[in-house]
Amino acid sequence: MKSEKAASFRIFLLLAAFLSEKPLRAEAPLKAPDDLLLATMEKELHRGQSELAKQDPAPYFASYNVTDGESLVILSAQGGILTSTRTRHRAADVSMRIGAPALDNTHDQERFSGITSGKLPQRDDPDAIARVLWKLSYEEYRKARQAYTNVKTKTAVRAKDEDDSPDFSEEKPSTYTDKAASVAFPEQKAWEELARRYSASFRRYPEVEESLVFLYAEKSHNYLVSTEGTKIVTADAIFRVMIEAETRADDGMQLMRVETFQFSDPAKFPSEAEVAATAKKMASDLSALHAAPLAEPYDGPALLSGRAAAVFFHEVLGHRVEGQRQRGRDEGQTFTKKVNEKILPDFLSVTDDPTLRILGGTELSGFYRFDDEGSPASRVEVVKDGILRNFLMGRLPVKNFSSSNGHGRAQSGLMPVGRQGNLIVTSSKAIPDVQLRSRFVEEIKKQGKPYGLYFEDIQGGFTLTSRDLPQAFQVLPVMVWRVYADGRPDKLVRGVDIVGTPLTVLSRIAATGDTTSVFNGICGAESGSVPVSAAAPAMLFTDMEVQKRKYGDARPPILPPPPGATENDNKEGAK
């Protein structure tokens, strides 16, 4: 995920905490899509636009985007509940554009003047809702008017932009109402008991210094109306179980494992046996990492598992093909002028398809029907047979790409920009994974290296796309193995990050496996945190560079954990 953003679990935890600021009011459980709310939004939008049309300058576009939902957040550790909060939230984003599509208040550095946000009354009181929308609309008009003045001044005194595309694309209005049946929301007490049992699994592993089990449920209705005639109502539901376990090496390095279960139906919750097996594997991994030696800087052959390759492509390629990164004086524009040129080996293709809900039996986080600007989601062929073909576009045009392809996404309260949905890498020359490993060992021998590195799992990363910074990336592996040329058993190492520049590293892919793996996560960038998925087969790189990871010097706990709970749980686990 982009720049300073941390691993996906941490990002999601912060987002969940934000949704849990205030307790649920008993007055208003979430119901079916709300016709009264939608009618109030439409009425106030058109009333406001009619009044503001008398102003100079007048808006040429306005929209209301309302999210009406409820969430349940439970955080548990060692069999106890740390947090349990059920929250109802109803919030509005008011967007407004002054000027004309060719040049408006959102131009360049004033991009985020196009939105004002606030909370709406949770009760269906049309007068109260209309009054809040009126207030937000007036605040947004004042902000947009000032920004438009700034834009005109700056445009008049500075050199012409290299890309003089319009600031807003013309799109056909969309009308849609989700008819999906409402998903039953979990009962809070039952979930708390489930969280207790899940988190108690770690009590039998004294080597785990800290563990958390995070249960999250959210269902929402999303309403979008615009002066262009768009009227969309969609329903969403998501359920997640996230498990985190941490320990600390003797030298102070923090070691972490994170596993996630995601589903759209609460009936698909993992069983206690599944969670217990996951906890056991995580504890085993942490014990092995604790004993593992520190890795050294390395440059040579590398093999990425499918899951690791998926995260790698999200960071290294995905962010750089987002539409807004192709224009603006501050953007590095790595691939802007490489359309119809080769950027990957000819056996690789990349698509982004948010219309896919399931891939290979795994539910995808990046599924949606319409983006946050009201454009229908669509499959985008980004790279075909190694050749760059397209970018991920919202309604901000770039040179030679004048229309949205349904990728304008944002967290509530922020302006949408082009973002990834479900990024999928496919190979036309896949070989069985066993053969891929053999070819990896051959490459190690060919280069005269004593070993290569196998990256089994990656927790996240960041990429730099601003022009005033190196066009580089840093990916954060968790489980990394030395694979020896002489046939010795693989050896786990720790404290290593993958680093490099995209144009170089993407040209070093030599082969892929035949099994696709999926990574689901939360991606952070300038338009906030959005759910995404990435999928890819295992990949062999002829050359990859790694560096040592920075870590602290805090000592591990001096005292062992209390013996009673651990001993009792070990006895129960042995039954």
Language model features with spans:
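Short linear motifs in exposed loops
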Residues: 235, 392, 492-494
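Short loop/turn microsegments at loop-to-beta-strand junctions
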Residues: 376-378, 478-479
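Residue-level structural signal for beta-strand termini and adjacent loop
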Residues: 257-260, 394-396, 494-496
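Active-site bordering "gate/hinge" segments
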Residues: 25-370, 375, 384-387, 400, ...
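Hydrophobic alpha-helical bundle architecture
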Residues: 366, 426-504, 520-527
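C-terminal, non-catalytic macromolecule-binding modules
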Residues: 389-443
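Bacterial N-terminal signal peptides
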Residues: 10-21
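N-terminal secretory signal peptides that target proteins for export/translocation
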Residues: 1-7
